[in-house]
Amino acid sequence: MDLGTANTIIIKDDKIVLDEPSVAAFDNRTGEMIAVGTKAREMYEKGNANIRTIRPLREGVIADFDAAEHMIRGMIRMISRRRGWFTPSLRMVVCIPSGSTEVEIRAVRDSSEHAGGRDVYMIYEPMAAAIGVGIDVLAPEGHMIVDIGGGTTEIAVISLGGIVEDQSIDTAGDELTQDIMDHMREKHQIKVGERTAEQIKIQVGAVYADIDDAPADFTVWGANMMDTMPRKVEVNYREIAECLDNSIGKIESAILRTLEATPPELYADIVANGVVLTGGGALLRGLDKRLSKRFGLDFKIAENPLHSVAIGTGIALKNIHNFNFLFR
């Protein structure tokens, strides 16, 4: 299970059986969960006094233990109904940010166990991402992963089944979305919600002005902050690249810190092997080009960046006895 801030992905027998937004909706009158995943996401920021929508994870870790437990249980129940599974107890591998504290790790473990996990193992996200893109993490060779998720960006140098150097920062997809919301308010004087800002990021999100296949401008409707009248704005990729520049700079600084701390022999391996970009943030237009120019290394986007971590977690589940970097 890739228990992400933005999405939760579950893999069983090498197949993705669930890929849903990490959102749960509750009835305030009864306290019962009424929707999970996509259905709950559709209610997000659109509820009334009787309905409360929650994103249980923030910055890659559980922010609401009870909601997280309900969400995990609901998602397992969802795939059990779809596929006719009987799941009284499960062996699970769950990924967590490399910078997680003991308290945060315990919260993930407890939520997973309460949701039906009999045997729960943990794996750090960059290790799972490396496995998911086909890297032999047990080899005596240095590889570098930059995983830009919803809540955290994970940067790691991996060799001999361990993380040699790493950085885990909370500048990631959510912060980029907030940057766009702020930009629309400050430059265009319109208010947009999180879902609209996400759409802007998908349609015209970029971090480099000189890109191939530039996307068409994206039309956004919002409430004019001056008079609340509806207003239409055409947003282009260049202005989004400008508004995201500061946050991408923070990610670049974290990459630099990791490279500076990397032993010389492993650095030489990274020069030869390049750096793999995974996570939803890897899809920002021009990111690989910008980072390659900044560091003089070959940054390349993973073949399946959205699912690399989940795929690696599924492989780890099948190799529990061979991967001693898994832990409980």
Residue ranges of model-derived segments:
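Nucleotide/phosphate-binding catalytic cleft detector across ATP-hydrolyzing
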Residues: 1-148, 156-276, 282-328
